[in-house]
């Protein structure tokens, strides 16, 4: 039986397009990552019509759906079995994600314990080798 989230609203993003850096399309040396324009005559900083938009607090997501995955859960990074037990009472709100540095031996233990505690994992199959018949 799969665990379903306690609350699963429709996740609405106010803006899905990336904010790009001013004149990054003009010069190859400028990356597209956002940098706030600081110049005294800058059109973007002065918010002229037709220029790139600047990120501000108004583009933030709804507080209830912020950091929520499409499944309706929020992520919690797990490094060992003990950290998994923190999610015991919150298993309908948070799901575990096994950290990158965890070995495959410990991953098996975490996946096993998560099944017992009925905690959902985002990456239960990560770095688990299947037995090959020789």
UniProtKB/Swiss-Prot annotation:
Coiled coil: none annotated. Signal peptide: none annotated. GO terms for molecular function: structural constituent of ribosome. The keyword Ribonucleoprotein applies. GO terms for cellular component: cytosolic large ribosomal subunit. Keywords: Ribonucleoprotein, Ribosomal protein. One of its GO terms (biological process) is translation. Changing residue 93 to V: In strain: TB12.O3+4+8, TB131.O3+4+8, TB132.O3+4+8, TB144.O3+4+8, TB150.O3+4+8, TB153.O3+4+8, TB173.O3+4+8, TB189.O3+4+8, TB19.O3+4+8, TB192.O3+4+8, TB198.O3+4+8, TB202.O3+4+8, TB27.O3+4+8, TB35.O3+4+8, TB358a.O3+4+8, TB64.O3+4+8, TB80.O3+4+8 and TB98pp.O3+4+8. The keyword Ribosomal protein applies. This is Large ribosomal subunit protein eL32.
């Amino acid at each position: 039986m799969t665990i379903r989230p306690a609350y699963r609203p429709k996740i609405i993003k106010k803006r899905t397009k990336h904010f790009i850096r001013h004149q990054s399309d003009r010069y190859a040396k400028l990356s597209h990552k956002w940098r706030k324009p600081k110049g005294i005559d800058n059109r973007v900083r002065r918010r002229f019509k037709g220029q790139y938009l600047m990120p501000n607090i108004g583009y933030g997501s709804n507080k209830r759906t912020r950091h929520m995955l499409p499944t309706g859960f929020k992520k919690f990074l797990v490094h060992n079995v003990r950290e998994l037990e923190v999610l015991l009472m919150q298993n309908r709100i948070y799901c575990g994600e096994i950290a990158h540095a965890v070995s495959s031996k410990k991953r098996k233990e975490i996946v096993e314990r998560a099944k017992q505690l009925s905690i959902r994992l985002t990456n239960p199959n990560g770095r688990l080798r299947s037995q090959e018949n020789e």
